[in-house]
Every structure is written in C-alpha cells, then in structure tokens.
C-alpha cells in the first residue's frame, strides 16, 4: 500500500514506540511491555490507512477531455446552486465533497490546465459539513485554466484537520486527476464550475477522487 510522504512523520512515533516496547518485552520478558505495544501498533495501522494513496484510473489512462473529476473521496454535500456567500465572484455552480476520517485524503486536480492563482486563508476549524465552514475555516483556493475554461477548487479543513498540504503553485501545469496535495484528518473540498457545465452528481452520492465525473463541459474542446 502506497503511503503519502506527509504521513511518514505521523507513523514514525507510534511505529517506533511499538517496536521498542516489543523488543523490551522480549528481552526482559515483561508481559506489560508486549501488551503496551499493541495500541501503538493499532494506531500505526490506522494512520497508514488514513494516509494511503491508492492508484486511480486517471493515473494510467487520461479521462475524457470534457469531464471534471472529483478531487477527493467522500460524500457530495452540495451539487448545483452555490451556497450563499461561498462562490468566487462570477456565475458558478458548486460541488462540495465531505471527507470523513476513513476516506482517502489525497487531493487531486478536478481539471487539467495551468494553475493561474493560489491563495491560502487562515481561519476557524468548524465541522466541515457545516455551510459556514466554506468561508470561515482555514482553506486553500486554486484556479486552473485551460484555454477559455476555468475551474476553481478549494481545500477546506474541518474540526480535526489542522493542516493543508498544497503541492502546486501558479504556473504549474496539471492533468485532470493529478495529485495536488492532501488535508489531514477530516475535511471538505469545494469545486466551482461555470454554468455551461452540466453537474453529474447529486447530494448524498459517494464519489472517488480521480474517477467520478462530477461535471461535464457542454461543448468539446
């Protein structure tokens, strides 16, 4: 199982503690040390699952050129009209995906093109499923442009998530579904597409990052 590199510092402490206690238990024949190693081993296993980075179809085959893909695994919270006061200036549709603590937290670009803008906003740590988290929580906003097509997407942290990792900067070229970063421990992602796109998902639907088409351009490139 592939682990995102941001996860290794978190895995090192419980993994090292588990190993040290196991060795101590064997060398000194202390049963308590062997038993104490198990919770650390369980925590290591959970963190490994949390920071997992599975391959997706877009990693081996380019998606359809008109498709906008989900940037993350999770459940669709918003599909269609933007929440009040949330969308960037302009005429947009919104798709928001809520990530639970058991979902893959690696984030992917929903569409191809050049990163034209990147901004980070510090903020609160409200529950990510609450509407006001979109404009009050800590977040990172990225704009990607391909010709006359523009898609805006945001990484938004929640109650448990306390750090956003964004690995692209303005000027970078990204492919649809390409890895662009991750959010740690529960969060949401908002995607904004123009009115000319058709939203393909519905509220409550489960989606997979880099695989599920959440919107489609109405005209081919």
Per-segment meaning from a language model:
Residues 1-221:
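Short amphipathic, positively biased membrane-proximal segments
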């Amino acid at each position: 199982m592939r682990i995102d590199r941001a996860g290794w510092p978190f895995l090192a402490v419980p993994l090292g503690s588990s190993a040290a206690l196991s060795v101590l238990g064997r060398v000194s024949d202390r049963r308590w040390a062997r038993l104490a190693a198990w919770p650390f081993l369980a925590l290591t296993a959970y963190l490994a699952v949390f920071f997992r980075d599975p391959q997706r179809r877009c990693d081996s085959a380019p998606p359809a050129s008109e498709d906008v893909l989900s940037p993350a695994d999770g459940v669709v919270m918003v599909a269609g009209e933007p929440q009040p006061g949330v969308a960037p200036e302009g005429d947009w549709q919104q798709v928001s995906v809520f990530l639970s603590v058991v979902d893959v937290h690696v984030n992917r670009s929903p569409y191809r093109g050049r990163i034209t803008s990147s901004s980070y906003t510090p903020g609160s740590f409200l529950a990510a499923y609450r509407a006001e988290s979109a404009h009050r929580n800590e977040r990172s906003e990225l704009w990607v442009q391909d010709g006359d097509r523009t898609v805006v997407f945001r990484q938004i942290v929640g109650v448990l998530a306390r750090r956003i990792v964004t690995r692209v900067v303005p000027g970078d070229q990204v492919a649809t579904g390409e890895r662009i970063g991750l959010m740690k421990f529960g969060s949401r992602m908002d995607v904004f597409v123009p009115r000319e796109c058709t939203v393909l998902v519905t509220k409550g639907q489960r989606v997979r990052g880099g695989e599920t088409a959440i919107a489609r351009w109405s005209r081919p490139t």
